[in-house]
Design a protein with these regions (language model features):
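Ser/Thr- (and often Asn-) enriched beta-sheet segments in non-cytosolic proteins
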Residues: 23, 158-160, 190
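Generic preference for flexible, low-structure residues
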Residues: 67, 93-95, 149, 159, ...
């Protein structure tokens, strides 16, 4: 039930809505971040010690988040209280309990790097060069290339049409491999210019 699930998201002893670091030797885990609605892609940037995360919002409000590691407290990205999206019509959800604040920061949450309204249905995210990244999109049937500046803000955001749902992406040796859903095929793009 929606209300039970969303209540679990806010509890620190629940794993709902959390990004976890799992010890593969003993299955112990540590909560890296919380307040996530529907994570789709994760990329650990070892060089810069952060995680990029793509996330589906409700009706709109898809996000790319930057999760700083080794913080003193667990960062909260706001769900189910903050989102650039809107509620779906539902008799189960009590909207007054879940207002979907448009500003995350004003309510004590971490702002996304970017929110997409209307929804683009982001998929995987990966790094393709020194500080260039790319995220796939299922609804928008495209790729989003972007850089992060010294303040870790998105710059040079560029949309490249693919005309198919991009389910997953992998970067290897100046090539971006796209796992395309509409035709169950693999697309390859030379990204050596980045």
């Amino acid at each position: 039930m929606i209300i039970v699930r969303d209540t679990l998201l806010k509890k620190k002893n629940s794993i709902n809505g959390k990004i976890l670091k799992i010890n593969i030797n003993n299955s112990d885990y540590e909560i890296i971040s919380m307040g996530h609605r529907n994570p789709q892609g994760l990329f650990f940037d070892k060089e810069n010690n952060f995680i990029l995360e793509t996330e589906h919002g409700p009706k709109g409000g898809d996000e790319i988040n930057l999760i700083e590691l080794n913080q003193n407290k667990i960062p909260n990205y706001g769900w189910p209280l903050a989102s650039a999206g809107e509620h779906y019509r539902s008799t189960e959800l009590k909207y007054k309990n879940y207002p979907l604040y448009k500003s995350h920061k004003e309510h004590g949450f971490i702002e996304p790097l970017i929110s997409f309204v209307p929804s683009i249905a982001p998929s995987e995210v990966t790094k393709i060069s020194n500080n260039y990244y790319v995220a796939g999109s299922m609804r928008n049937k495209s790729l989003r290339f972007f850089q992060l500046d010294n303040d870790k803000k998105i710059i040079n955001l560029t949309r490249v049409e693919v005309f198919e749902r991009v389910r997953d992406i992998i970067y290897r040796e100046n090539k971006l491999y796209m796992f395309l859903e509409d035709t169950a095929s693999i697309g390859v793009i030379d990204v050596s210019q980045f």
